[in-house]
Amino acid sequence: TCSGSITNDSYTLHCFSNAVHGGVDLERSLAKSCNSSFANIGLSLNLRDFSETCEELLFNRDLPIDFAGSGSRFSLSADSGKSEVMATAIGQGKTLVSPLHMALIVCAIQNDGVLMRPYLADRVENSDGGRVEQYEPSVYGRLMTEKEAKILRRYMKTVVEDGTASALKSDSYVAAGKTGSAEY
């Protein structure tokens, strides 16, 4: 149950605007960006499994790109204190992620868990419009199961329909997303 903040080992983490979310499941936690809920989840996780999952999502690895881009870092270990775990569970702490990396994860979610290799140009044409080179889409690999991707898509739609991104809600289109902060 979210009371607007969580304290553990003298470290207090607040929900945005000190919002009190009450009893929330994972979907509502994501929709409302409930820091208390994610801190509790982080404290309950096996840190090794948490780290492995992040590495499956390409943290601490080179991104599958053929152009300049920065990688992302996830750092938790058995020695990590509770405050570091809590901060990391809300995407803060020592975690660094580039916008490109987040876009790749979202693309995999939308593509049933499969990540395609990103490229900057579809084709190269000469001055007459003739095709000089055509680049073909290629699969990088699976970042998550189809079922996990489907659940995440539903959760991200809830963020727009009844969560922190509700300003994007429209009868003209369907949108999904996740809000976030660069620092807490």
Features from the language model and the residues they span:
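Beta-lactam-recognizing serine transpeptidase/beta-lactamase-like catalytic domain environment
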Residues: 1-184
